């Protein structure tokens, strides 16, 4: 099995790492899947990554059809509306890797195209947007981790993806416990993204404040209880996958980056998913419920819901 045609859906913070890595390979077809105004903009402007403009092909979903590998790098909220595009790209032999945050994007994609196309995967990259495009440190990036959900773990497509990535500067490794790896990353996201997003401070806050550490630990306990109830043994991967990329204490992870930019966040994928699973399993999730509602309120604040200047002066009172 050889991978010669690679399609990337989503050219943001995560997609930029993939585009950067594969652009050095001249023996494959590489394209970003986009149509309409976004597709025209990518054709015109390219992808600005680490101070350089990259110009992969830009394919409509139909032009990308039957790609050997489709890598999905979307925000969680964009996935439902992208399922038709994913179906259009997917051919009989297409392998799909979802590098989205969370633990259920594979299930959502499988509902549209069939689970046999999914090679489970995750990415750890501290990528952020600046005025001149997306930036990340290739040297400190943990990279892409992937594996089969069920044995055999050394399947032909795992070997094909290893061979493909091996000809790039991308950091990667295959694993035989991909679900535990995904939950380990999910834990990093929930426990590190959410409290700092509420406070509006860099990640050094967890080191410097026992109060921030206490909130992070509360979120962690709830997630680990849910994982255990679902048969996920986090200890399988703690030694090799318990940490993210090295960053400065001023670093702001994706949820806070979204709030800083006035965008809605992926809180439904983080605490929203854990609240739903907790209810299904009878496990209380008070820390996640608080984080969920606080970040939803911060989104409302960004939307202008709490702008009480001008004529919006109807009297209210504490209740």
Feature-to-residue mapping (PLM):
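NAD(P)-dependent Rossmann-like dehydrogenase/reductase catalytic/cofactor-binding core
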Residues: 2, 217-319
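A structural signal for isolated positions on well-ordered beta-strands in alpha/beta enzyme cores
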Residues: 7, 29-31, 97, 119, ...
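Glycine-rich beta-alpha junction loops
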Residues: 37, 101-103, 122-127, 150, ...
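NAD(P)+-binding Rossmann beta1-loop-alpha1 motif at the extreme N-terminus of oxidoreductases
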Residues: 1-55
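Internal alpha-helical scaffold of NAD(P)-dependent oxidoreductase catalytic cores
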Residues: 88-89, 112-117, 132-235
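Short, charged/polar "capping" segments at the starts of alpha-helices
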Residues: 38-43, 106-107, 154
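Short, well-ordered alpha-helices that flank and scaffold nucleotide-derived cofactor binding pockets
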Residues: 20-24, 84-88, 111, 272, ...
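Rossmann-like NAD(P)(H) cofactor-binding subdomain of soluble oxidoreductases
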Residues: 51-135
């Amino acid at each position: 099995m050889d991978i010669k045609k690679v399609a990337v859906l989503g050219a943001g913070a995560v997609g930029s790492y993939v585009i950067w890595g594969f652009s050095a390979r001249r023996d494959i077809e590489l394209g970003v899947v986009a149509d309409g105004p976004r597709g025209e903009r990518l054709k015109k402007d390219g992808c600005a990554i680490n101070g350089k403009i990259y110009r992969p092909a830009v394919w409509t979903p139909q032009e990308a059809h039957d790609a050997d590998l489709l890598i999905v790098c979307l925000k969680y909220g964009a996935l439902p509306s992208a399922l038709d595009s994913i179906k259009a790209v997917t051919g009989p032999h297409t392998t799909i890797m979802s590098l989205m945050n969370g633990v259920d994007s594979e299930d959502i994609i499988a509902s549209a195209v069939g689970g046999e196309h999914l090679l489970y995967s995750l990415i750890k990259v501290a990528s952020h947007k600046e005025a001149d495009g997306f930036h990340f440190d290739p040297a400190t990036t943990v990279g892409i981790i992937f594996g089969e959900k069920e044995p055999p773990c050394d399947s032909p497509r795992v070997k094909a993806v290893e061979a493909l990535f091996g000809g790039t500067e991308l950091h990667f490794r295959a694993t035989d416990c991909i679900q535990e790896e995904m939950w380990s990353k999910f834990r990093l996201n929930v426990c590190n993204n959410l409290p700092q997003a509420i406070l509006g401070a860099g990640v050094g806050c967890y080191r410097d404040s026992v109060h921030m550490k206490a909130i992070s630990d509360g979120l962690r306990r709830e997630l680990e209880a849910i994982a255990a109830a679902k048969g996920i043994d986090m200890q399988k991967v703690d030694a090799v996958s318990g940490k993210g990329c090295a960053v400065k204490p001023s670093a702001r992870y994706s949820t806070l980056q979204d709030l800083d930019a006035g965008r809605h966040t992926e809180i439904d994928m983080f605490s929203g998913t854990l609240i739903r699973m907790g209810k299904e399993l009878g496990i209380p999730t008070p820390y996640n419920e608080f984080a969920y509602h606080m970040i939803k309120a911060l989104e409302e604040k960004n939307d202008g819901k709490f702008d009480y200047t001008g004529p919006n002066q109807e009297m209210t009172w504490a209740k």
